[in-house]
Amino acid sequence: MSQLRIFSYLPNPRIWKATIVARLAGVDLDVRGAAPKELQSWLWDFDARPLSAAEGTEASEVRGHAGFQGKLHKTAAFLEAHPFGTVPAAFSPDGKVGIFESNSIMRAVARLAGDKLGLYGKDPYEASRIDSFLDASLVFARDSQIYLLALGSGSLSEEIYGPTRDAFATYMNGIDGALSKGRKFIVGDRLTLADVCFVAEFALFNNEKPRARDLKTRGLEPILSEKLDQLFPHAIAHFARLSKHPAFAPDVVPYMEKIERATAK
């Protein structure tokens, strides 16, 4: 039996926060899901699966939230476990306890392992500093999600672009500064949840690359500029290095290769 079940649209770099930590710490996960469009015909439940006609009449119909259009089929049990009704949605093995938001799901995986590797810091001070970086990522994550959805739907405006550009610069400056002076990790002297979170969020934002031409036709410069290595050298090198790590590579490498192929078209 898995120690944690996760339901989400796939692929989803924010799920990597859990899968990477699970590989590092030896936690057994059960990940279920499908492409965003397919989830409209899924039953949103602990036992998430493609929806049958009979189940469709029993499940609650809720209008789609960010990233989804139309109605979604959510059971009462799903909504009780996940009051905000969003994915990724994690569950305890019995399905009674719901855990939501990717950073919290990642923390849960570390806790399930007893965190023998110090992924959540070696003491309360480091743990709190890690939390600080995770909280900072939430500001960038919110803006990046709105930005990428607008870019994909052709509804991008300067009101969305400007704040996202600024949020990206703020986030990357903070990460780059934390990695300056020869530091190998964002917090302390070992790999932590802060590093895992950074890799996931930066990889997700790379979905801007295939839309670079669309941006330029609107008179906007890609936020992921060609000078990224010069602007944030430590952060970019850190991402490249961790992408090759055995716990990261199974998620990161195929995803980034797919983005590069789409960008080259």
Residue ranges and their predicted role:
Residues A240, K244-P250:
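Primarily interfacial, aromatic-capped hydrophobic alpha-helices that serve as membrane anchors
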Residues G121-A240:
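GST-like fold's C-terminal all-alpha helical module
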Residues M1-R165:
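GST-like domain detector, emphasizing the conserved glutathione-binding G-site
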